[in-house]
């Protein structure tokens, strides 16, 4: 009688344990495109129209949540303890994923769908790897868009120049200029993109023109970014215009911005 091969039992046991222990979505191929949701940014913007808006409000910023799944889960639990009327929404500074894989987007969604506040995000450079850009478009919608909250316009755009080999198309400064003109009657304009113009991953032929556009637009108040993983709030070009870089969520920190008419205050918070 043939004895059973113990190695087969071990492999079977390992497989069963992995399947039973896995509480998150599983992906059979890194090329798989099966998003769990669509047009998340527009859904969040639509939610904003259902709540009272005024010129005094606060919002939170998180960024670079790739591989920070435990920290993201903890942030959601932390933020859900914040009173609903003290925060309007959350901005995400990009890099939802590390490799642009569908399962990474799904892992992010598994956690963020439990957050009680609307979340609006910009595309990060890691989100453009592989077929990640297409998945981002399905999950979140357009890369360049704007929305209003009260008397403030938020302009969100792709600034990941290196991912397109600095071909001159990212960021789209013509589109950006048009959006600032459309928002001319608003009290404030706040910008959101992943890579700040001082980074070498930003097309340096566009850095000064963009900085000049932002600093000379009368109602421009703040430009928000991620990418560098460390908190920074300063003038990058000595032109009086402030830039804010949000830290990676791996540091268990995020940023709160308070808007009071045309005055903004910024604070880094930990949880």
Describe the role of every protein-language-model region.
Residues 1-22:
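Sec-dependent bacterial lipoprotein signal peptides
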